[in-house]
Design a protein with these regions (language model features):
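Short acidic/glycine-rich loops and adjacent helix/strand connectors
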Residues: 1-170
């Protein structure tokens, strides 16, 4: 099974291709663009990963994104409501990008994937969204040498949780 993981639209966009549980290639977009902390869609990183695996987009089984935008949007709305009227200015500055792009992330990702070299426009793989911290945890656990481990993620931002704990099992 070939799975492409994508991180984009935040600091350090990147792509990683995993085949049957083994990392085939992983690279940040800034390695190609020479733009530090490049947040754009990682088209060149994806192309590199696909090239290393010897496949095209249409041969991927799954493409996964590191975040669940609707869950994050819910957190933002509830946070702004809880801090009204103090956070109103911040709310107004954040909403345009959410209403224009982030709530339509699935469509945007599909559009971007269709621009990757070798993509057959009507043959996109399944697109999944993982929870932000689950993405951190799985990327730490699965490449590790352990069959079973406690996995702690401490991060200041995500959908809701900031310090989740999991039990990793092969």
């Amino acid at each position: 099974m070939d799975i492409l993981g994508i991180s984009a639209y935040y600091d350090d966009s990147a792509a990683c291709l995993v085949r049957d549980g083994e990392i085939i290639a992983a690279v940040q977009e800034e390695r190609f663009t020479r733009k530090k902390h490049d947040a754009r869609f990682p088209r060149q990183a994806i192309q590199y990963c696909l090239s290393e695996a010897g496949i095209d987009v249409e041969h991927l089984d799954i493409v996964t994104f590191y975040d669940k935008p609707f869950v994050k949007f819910e957190r933002l709305l509830e946070t702004y409501i809880a801090n009204t009227p103090k956070g109103f200015r911040s709310f107004l500055s954040a909403m345009p990008v959410w209403l224009k792009e982030k709530l339509y992330l699935k469509s945007l990702l599909k559009k971007e994937l269709k621009q990757v070299d070798g993509c057959v426009k009507n043959k996109l793989p399944q697109l999944l969204f993982a929870e932000h911290h689950q993405s951190h945890a799985t990327s730490a656990f699965f490449p590790s040498p352990f069959e079973k481990a406690a996995v702690l993620c401490m991060d200041g931002v995500g959908e809701w949780a900031t310090t989740p704990v999991w039990q990793g099992k092969e």
